[in-house]
Amino acid sequence: MKATDLLAMFSLSVVLSACGGVQAGGNVQSGVQAMLAGNNQTALSYFQAAAQQDPTYIYNAQLQLGVMSYLGRAQYLTGNYAQAVQTLEQARVQNSGDNLAQLYLGLSQARLGNQQAGLQNIAASMKQIMVWLNFLNGNYPGQGWDPDGAIQSRIQNAQAMMSSGNVEWYRLFADGEAVGLGVAQQEQTFRQLNIDAT
């Protein structure tokens, strides 16, 4: 094989892989919009397509949130808890600091009956999300991160209940889901503000 043939094949593979990333990005963006609109089955389809195109695709570069994190969240929101656990564990391997993946992992584990592991992951993720929100609000006031305190209030309610030892699971699920979707909405709002500013 000639050097020019090898170069042509390499160039083609680079172009095709770039196209996969662009397609994955478009599918993740559409999936996020569907998820935030409550169209979880549609969101799941978009995230599945993105994961097939590029399972390592990072949608939110600042927070390093990958497609597997979004896919796992959509699996949880559509009741596919066992699949969600597998996908979210994979997302946590890709980014151990993905607090939303850890939150939904804990919610999925608890829904499957592994309440001890679920509670540990829910508590740890909520603690880190609260630290993150406090950091953002302290260092970037007026940027719109949880302006009415709804996310922080849900976290505080959940933390108080978990520390009491008297966990009402239906309330913890509701609080956890509200925190997860609230953070996702805030991320999308902030992302859009940054896009509009450029």
Say what each PLM segment does.
Residues 51, 107-134:
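TPR/TPR-like (Sel1-like) alpha-helical repeat modules
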Residues 63-64, 70, 104, 138:
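Canonical tetratricopeptide repeat
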Residues 132-198:
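Terminal, low-structured helical/coil segments at or just beyond the last alpha-helical repeat
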